[in-house]
C-alpha cells in the first residue's frame, strides 16, 4: 500500500471513530496487574480503567481460568472523600461502635487481597548478600560466617482476646476506608486509569499456557480486551503502584514513586516469573543464585501487555534489561529482540554466584500501565523456524533454532487446520516454549535451491507457487524464473516479518534484458495490527510481452543466517479481502440499536463490493446487513435489539461475502480495537472474540439498606439556613450513595443528614 493509501485509511479511521462516539464511550481497561499467573494457582489482580460502574466478575478467554470480583473503587468526589475522612475520625474515637446490621455486613465483607513480594526465607550473608538456607552456618558463596537473626525476646504472653463482633466490624470498616484513601489520587497523570477493579483469579492445573484475553463485564457494557498470560513456573509480584500523579514541570520528582528500601530489590529462585510495574525514574532489581553451566533464558513481556500508548514516544513501554554479576559488573544487556521491542537475553552462567537482573524504561518514563512479566530459567525458547509455513493438509518437517531445545518436539498445526496464521510451540513433556507463527496456504510450495543468486542461475518455478527460502550468506540474492504473457499481472508477496523473521525483504521483477519492471521494499499491511515494522515486500507488475521474467529477493540490509527465512508467493492476482470489525465488543441499550465499523483490507487488486452480515444472530437481535461499496475501505454495520437486557454477553461473528468471477468467497471479520500510537499512528489491534451485551441504562443496584429514623435529639436547633434545596439534595445524594455502599454507619449518616437539612433555606 502506498503512503497516500495509508494516510487515506488513517483519515477514514478518524472519521469512523468520530461517528462511533457512542461505542467509544463504553467501558475501558488500560492495564491489568499482574498480567497473568501460574497454572494451578489462585492470585489477586487489579485492573485500572474507566466507566466500570456496576462491575461483575471479569472473564478470561479459553478454558481453565475463572475470575471472581472482590471490589470496585469508583472515582469519588471531594465531598465524598471529606465524608469518609470524617467517618474515619469518628470510628477511631474511643468508644465508637457500629450497628448490628453493619456488624453482620462486615462479617462477610471481603477486602481486596494484597499483591506483594514473597517473604525472604533464609539467612542473608552480611558480606556478599547471598541468600542461604535457614539451617546454613557459613555462606555458600564467600564462606563467611552467617549471623542468624535474633529471635524476639520472650516476654509475658499476652492474653488472647478475640474482639467482639462489633469491634471486629469497626476495625474492618476502618481498614476499608483507609484502603480507599491509600488508592486515591486527586491529580492523576492518566485519568483513564482512575477506576479500579479488584478480583481473584483461579487457574486450573491443566489450563493451557500462553496468551489469553481478559475483559471486565458491567451492568452497562463490556470493556476492551487486554492480554493475560498463563505461565508454567512459580511467580512473584511486586506491590502494585498507586495511580501516578500528574507531573508538574520543574517538580517531576513529586510524581515519582518512592519504593520502600526493603522493596528495592526482590530475591527470587529459578525458574521464576516476576511481575512488576515501572514508575517514572524507577529501576526494578531481582537477585537470584545461579550455578556454573546453567543456560538461562530471560524473556520479557512489556509491550505485548499494553501494545500502544497514545501519549508517548515511543508509543509503548520500551523495556531495558541488564544482568550483573555478584561484583556489580554488567554481563548482559538487551533492549529488544530483533524487531520486537520486548527484550530477550540468553546467558550461559560462567561461575557460581548471585546475579542481579534490572529492568527499567529506556527513557525512565513510568505509569501504572507500564506492567511487565519477566521469566528466567533454563527454559526452551524458539528463536526461529524453517520453513515459515506449509501447504494445508500436507506433512512438513520443521527445523527449530533456539535455546534449551534438547529433547523438545515442534509439531506443525493439525492436518485439518485451515489456511491462515497459526501459533506453534516446542514441547518437552508438559513444558512449552514460546509461541511462534506458522502459515498455511492452499498453493503449491517449494524450497529455494542454491545456487540461484543471478538470472543466469535462476531457479525455474511454475505459477502459482510459494517459495520457502532464506538468506544463506550476507548479500545473498535468490532469483526465480517464471514464464509470462503480455498483459498478464504478476504478484510477488513476501511473508517474513509478519511471521517473526528478521528478514527485511526487497523484491524486484526484471525482464530477460535485465530491465526492472517493478520493485518494492516495504509494504504497509493494516491487517497486521501489532506490527509497526512493515518490512515485507509486495508488488503487482503488468508484463509487457510474452517470455521469461525473473523475480529477485534479498535482504535490504544484506543480513543473513538461519533466522532470515521468508515465504515468497509468486502468482497471478488472487483477489481477496481481510475484514476488521471495530470495536471488539458491542454494547446495546434496551430496545435500541448501534452500529459497528467494518474495515476492508483489499488484496491483489480486488475492488468489488462486499456484503456484510452477522452470522446466526441469537433471538432478540436483528440486523439487515450492509454492503461495502466497490473501491471503498470502510462502512458501518447496524444491529438492533428487542430485548430489555441480557443476563450475560454472547459472542457474535461478522462475515463478508464477495464475488470474484463466478466464485463467491466468504471471509470472517476479525474483532479489533482502533488504537493510537505516539500521538498520530492508528492501528487495528485484533481481539479473539466479539461479545455483545444488551443493557438497561436505568439499572441501579437495589437499595438493600434502610436507614433508621433520625432522632430529634441530634437535629441542630439554631443552624444558619444558607443552603438552597438543590444544594441540599446534592449533599443528601452523596451521603446516601456512601451509605448504600456500607461506608457510613447509621449514626454518622443520620447526623450528617440532620446537619444538612437544618441548613435548608425555607
Predicted regions and their residues:
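Acidic, Ser/Thr/Pro-rich low-complexity intrinsically disordered segments
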Residues: 25-90, 267-432, 440, 444, ...
Amino acid at each position: 500500500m502506498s503512503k497516500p493509501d495509508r494516510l487515506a485509511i488513517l483519515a477514514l479511521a478518524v472519521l469512523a471513530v468520530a461517528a462511533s462516539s457512542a461505542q467509544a464511550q463504553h467501558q475501558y481497561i488500560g492495564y491489568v496487574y499482574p498480567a497473568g499467573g501460574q497454572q494451578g494457582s489462585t492470585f489477586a489482580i487489579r485492573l485500572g480503567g474507566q466507566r466500570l460502574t456496576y462491575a461483575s466478575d471479569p472473564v478470561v478467554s479459553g478454558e481453565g481460568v475463572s475470575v471472581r470480583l472482590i471490589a470496585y473503587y469508583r472515582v469519588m468526589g471531594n465531598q465524598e472523600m471529606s465524608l469518609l475522612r470524617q467517618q474515619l475520625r469518628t470510628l477511631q474515637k474511643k468508644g465508637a461502635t457500629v450497628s448490628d446490621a453493619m456488624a453482620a455486613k462486615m462479617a462477610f465483607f471481603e477486602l481486596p487481597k494484597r499483591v506483594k513480594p514473597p517473604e525472604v526465607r533464609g539467612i542473608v550473608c552480611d558480606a556478599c548478600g547471598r541468600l542461604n538456607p535457614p539451617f546454613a552456618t557459613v555462606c555458600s558463596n564467600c564462606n563467611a560466617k552467617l549471623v542468624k537473626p535474633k529471635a524476639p525476646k520472650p516476654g509475658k504472653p499476652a492474653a488472647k482476646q478475640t474482639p467482639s463482633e462489633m469491634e471486629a466490624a469497626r476495625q474492618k470498616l476502618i481498614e476499608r476506608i483507609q484502603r480507599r484513601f491509600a488508592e486515591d489520587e486527586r491529580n492523576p497523570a492518566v485519568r483513564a486509569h482512575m477506576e479500579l477493579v479488584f478480583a481473584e483469579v483461579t487457574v486450573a492445573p491443566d489450563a493451557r499456557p500462553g496468551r489469553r484475553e481478559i475483559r471486565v463485564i458491567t451492568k452497562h457494557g463490556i470493556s476492551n480486551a487486554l492480554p493475560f498470560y498463563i505461565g508454567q513456573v512459580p511467580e512473584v509480584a511486586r506491590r502494585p503502584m498507586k495511580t501516578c500523579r500528574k507531573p508538574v514541570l520543574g517538580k517531576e520528582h513529586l510524581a515519582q514513586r518512592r519504593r520502600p528500601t526493603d522493596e528495592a530489590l526482590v530475591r527470587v529462585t529459578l525458574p521464576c516469573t516476576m511481575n512488576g510495574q515501572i514508575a517514572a525514574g524507577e529501576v526494578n532489581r531481582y537477585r537470584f543464585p545461579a550455578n556454573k553451566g546453567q543456560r538461562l533464558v530471560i524473556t520479557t513481556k512489556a509491550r505485548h501487555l499494553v501494545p500502544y500508548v497514545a501519549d508517548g514516544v515511543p508509543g509503548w513501554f520500551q523495556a531495558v534489561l541488564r544482568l550483573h554479576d555478584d561484583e556489580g559488573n554488567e554481563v548482559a544487556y538487551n533492549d529488544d529482540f530483533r524487531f520486537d521491542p520486548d527484550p530477550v537475553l540468553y546467558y550461559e552462567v560462567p561461575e557460581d554466584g548471585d546475579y542481579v537482573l534490572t529492568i527499567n524504561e529506556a527513557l525512565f518514563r513510568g505509569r501504572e500501565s507500564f506492567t511487565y512479566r519477566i521469566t528466567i530459567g533454563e527454559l526452551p525458547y524458539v528463536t526461529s523456524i524453517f520453513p515459515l509455513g506449509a501447504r494445508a493438509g500436507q506433512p512438513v518437517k520443521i527445523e527449530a533454532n533456539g535455546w534449551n531445545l534438547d529433547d523438545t518436539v515442534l509439531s506443525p498445526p493439525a492436518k485439518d487446520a485451515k489456511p491462515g496464521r497459526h501459533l506453534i510451540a516446542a514441547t518437552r513433556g508438559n513444558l512449552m516454549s514460546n509461541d511462534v507463527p506458522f502459515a498455511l496456504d492452499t498453493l503449491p510450495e517449494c524450497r529455494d535451491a542454491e545456487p540461484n543468486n543471478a538470472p543466469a542461475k535462476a531457479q525455474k518455478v511454475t505459477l502459482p507457487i510459494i517459495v520457502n527460502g532464506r538468506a544463506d550468506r550476507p548479500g545473498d540474492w535468490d532469483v526465480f524464473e517464471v514464464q509470462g504473457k503480455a498483459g498478464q499481472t504478476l504478484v510477488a508477496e513476501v511473508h517474513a516479518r509478519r511471521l517473526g523473521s528478521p528478514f527485511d525483504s526487497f523484491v524486484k521483477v526484471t525482464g530477460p534484458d535485465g530491465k526492472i519492471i517493478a520493485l518494492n521494499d516495504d509494504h504497509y499491511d493494516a491487517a497486521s495490527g501489532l506490527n509497526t515494522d512493515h518490512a515485507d515486500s509486495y508488488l503487482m507488475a503488468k508484463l509487457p510481452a510474452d517470455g521469461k521474467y525473473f523475480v529477485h529477493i534479498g535482504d535490504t540490509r544484506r543480513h543473513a543466517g538461519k533466522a532470515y527465512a521468508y515465504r515468497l508467493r509468486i502468482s497471478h492476482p488472487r483477489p481477496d479481502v481481510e475484514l476488521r470489525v471495530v470495536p471488539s465488543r458491542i454494547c446495546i441499550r434496551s430496545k435500541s440499536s448501534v452500529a459497528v465499523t467494518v474495515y476492508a483490507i483489499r488484496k491483489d487488486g480486488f475492488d468489488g463490493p462486499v456484503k456484510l452480515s452477522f452470522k446466526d444472530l441469537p433471538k432478540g437481535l436483528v440486523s439487515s446487513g450492509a454492503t461495502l461499496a466497490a473501491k471503498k475501505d470502510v462502512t458501518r454495520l447496524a444491529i438492533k435489539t428487542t430485548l430489555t437486557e441480557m443476563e450475560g454477553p454472547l459472542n457474535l461473528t461478522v462475515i463478508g461475502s464477495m464475488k470474484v468471477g463466478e466464485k463467491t468467497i466468504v471471509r470472517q471479520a476479525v474483532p479489533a480495537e482502533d488504537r493510537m500510537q505516539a500521538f498520530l499512528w492508528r492501528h487495528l489491534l485484533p481481539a479473539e472474540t466479539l461479545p455483545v451485551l444488551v443493557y438497561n441504562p436505568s439499572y441501579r443496584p437495589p437499595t438493600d439498606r434502610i436507614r433508621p429514623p433520625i432522632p430529634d435529639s441530634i437535629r441542630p436547633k439554631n443552624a444558619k439556613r444558607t443552603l438552597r434545596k438543590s444544594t441540599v439534595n446534592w449533599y443528601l445524594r452523596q451521603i446516601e450513595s456512601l451509605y448504600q455502599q456500607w461506608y457510613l454507619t447509621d449514626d454518622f449518616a443520620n447526623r450528617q443528614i440532620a446537619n444538612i437539612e437544618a441548613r435548608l433555606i425555607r
